[in-house]
Design a protein with these regions (language model features):
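Beta-strand/loop substructures that line and gate deep hydrophobic ligand-binding cavities in soluble
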Residues: 83-141
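Hydrophobic ligand-binding cavity/cleft-lining segments
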Residues: 1-42, 46, 169-173
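Well-ordered beta-strand positions in beta-sheet-rich domains
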Residues: 5-7, 63-65, 90-92, 107
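Glycine-rich portal/gate segments that line the openings of hydrophobic small-molecule binding cavities
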Residues: 39-86, 90, 141-157, 168-172
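A generic structural signal for beta-strand entry/edge sites
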Residues: 1, 48, 75-77, 99-103
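Hydrophobic-ligand-binding modules of eukaryotic lipid transfer/binding families
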Residues: 1-11, 101, 130-133, 137-140, ...
């Protein structure tokens, strides 16, 4: 299994990050110019809810549906875990209150965890069938950029400039 984690300290109140999370369906698309769709099919992001993300990064079209498997929230912490329908991708967003604002962590994990067969399947998935989409550096760079955008959103209320959809879709695979 491949696990990528990017974290950032944001000098904005935890309440701002929690409000951003509470409006996730709308905020996901505004978060990055590469994010083009987010559908909360149940209207919320509670555990068991169905969700769909779509983003196009460097011409690669990532269109993923799945289920929220964990959703914890209190006055000092939130954690939301998404599992793809194919059960080969997990995305975790976690926020914590700090003395200077909030800490945000974004983790994306890919692959099967089943002993022996998991390693074989991961090789086939990542090295044979989906080699272009399994570009770990591209995914990590996108996560870093997402964190930078979130920093600007929560500290300055500044959203990134949108890229026209037709431009994003040109050559998307």
């Amino acid at each position: 299994m491949i696990v990528l984690t990017e974290q950032i300290e944001i000098p904005a109140s935890y309440e701002k990050s929690k409000a951003w999370t509470a409006n996730f369906e709308e905020e996901f698309v505004k978060w990055s110019p590469y994010h083009i769709e987010c559908n909360l099919y149940n209207g919320n992001y509670n555990a068991g809810s169905k969700i769909r993300f779509r983003e196009i990064v460097m011409g690669l079209d990532y269109d993923v549906t799945g289920t929220i498997t964990e959703c914890e929230q209190d006055e000092n912490h939130f954690r939301i875990v998404f599992r793809s329908d194919k059960k080969t991708a997990f995305i975790t967003f976690e926020g914590k209150r700090t003395k200077t604002g909030c800490h945000f962590s974004h983790t994306e994990a890919f692959g099967m965890t089943t002993p022996v067969i998991g390693a074989i399947m991961n090789f086939l998935i990542f090295k044979v069938f989906f080699r272009k989409k399994a570009n770990w550096q591209l995914i990590r760079d996108d996560m870093i950029l997402d964190n930078r955008y979130l920093y600007d959103i929560l500290t300055e209320g500044k959203y990134p400039e949108r890229i026209p959809l037709d431009k994003l879709l040109t050559g998307a695979k």
